[in-house]
């Protein structure tokens, strides 16, 4: 495979970021890309998000990691992968095409708290127990959030998804998100992100220069 062909340092699990929303009860089909039969809204959330043990339908990810590691040379690393909480909710609510949104609504915070954070916490644990050295959070819609909401949200991620797994959870966002705000949130929290990924459109030299200050 690519690891042998190109001598990459790491392998990463790619499992569609929307599987957790399907696990929670949303009807997801592929035609050819992912399509929800019904999008999430305040009025239907309690009716749609009904699965009592959603993590059980994600156990295939652990098996995929274990099987991949059986084939990896000892000097190669294995990285797990989940979608960011807001990104999952943005796609589930058909807001993922928007550049910006207004404030996160109270019902959206409730969905994050009651459904998405708990499932993703278990999802991270599942992948780490299967042998992943690190799990990356891919938050491709985080740029939609206003600065105040982004700050609150990042602290929630650090509390709900990172604190239990020191040095094992990284974070990536893109498309104009403020990396200054991401680094600030991580630096100020007792258990920071294990690593922060940067958009390919951003000069990594600029990030390094700022981090030296």
Label for each model-derived stretch:
Residues 17-28, 81-101, 130-153:
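Active-site-proximal loop/short-helix segments
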Residues 9-13, 78-82, 135-137, 169-173, ...:
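Hydrophobic faces of well-ordered beta-strands that scaffold small-molecule active sites
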Residues 162-213:
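Catalytic-face loop-and-helix region of soluble metabolic enzyme cores
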Residues 62-65, 144-158, 180, 200-212:
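Active-site-adjacent beta->alpha loops and helix N-cap segments on the catalytic face
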Residues 29-126:
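Active-site-proximal, glycine-rich beta->alpha crossover segments in alpha/beta enzymes
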Residues 1-30, 155, 159-160, 188-191:
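N-terminal basic, low-complexity leaders that serve as flexible interaction/assembly modules and, when applicable
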Residues 123-181:
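Aromatic-anchored, glycine/proline-accented short structural segments
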Residues 4, 121, 128-129, 184-189:
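Non-catalytic positions within long, well-ordered alpha-helices that form the structural scaffold/packing
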């Amino acid at each position: 495979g690519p690891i042998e062909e190109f001598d990459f340092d790491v392998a990463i699990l790619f499992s569609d970021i929307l599987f957790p929303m399907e696990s929670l009860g949303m009807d997801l089909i592929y035609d050819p890309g992912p399509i929800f039969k019904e999008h999430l809204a305040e009025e239907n959330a309690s009716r749609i998000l009904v699965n009592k043990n959603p993590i059980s339908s994600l156990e295939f990810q652990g098996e995929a990691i274990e099987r991949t590691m059986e084939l990896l040379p000892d000097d190669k690393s294995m990285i797990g992968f989940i979608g960011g909480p807001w990104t999952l909710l943005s796609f589930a609510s058909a807001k993922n095409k928007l550049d910006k949104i207004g404030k996160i609504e109270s019902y959206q915070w409730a969905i994050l708290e009651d459904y998405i954070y708990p499932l993703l916490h278990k999802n991270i644990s599942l992948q780490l127990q299967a042998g992943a050295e690190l799990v990356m959070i891919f938050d491709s819609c985080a740029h939609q959030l206003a600065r105040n909401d982004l700050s609150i949200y990042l602290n929630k991620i650090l509390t709900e998804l990172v604190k239990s797994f020191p040095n094992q959870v990284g974070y990536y966002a893109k498309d104009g998100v403020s990396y200054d705000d991401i680094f600030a949130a991580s630096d100020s929290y007792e258990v920071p992100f294990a690593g922060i990924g940067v958009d390919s459109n951003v000069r990594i030299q600029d990030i390094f220069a700022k981090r030296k200050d």
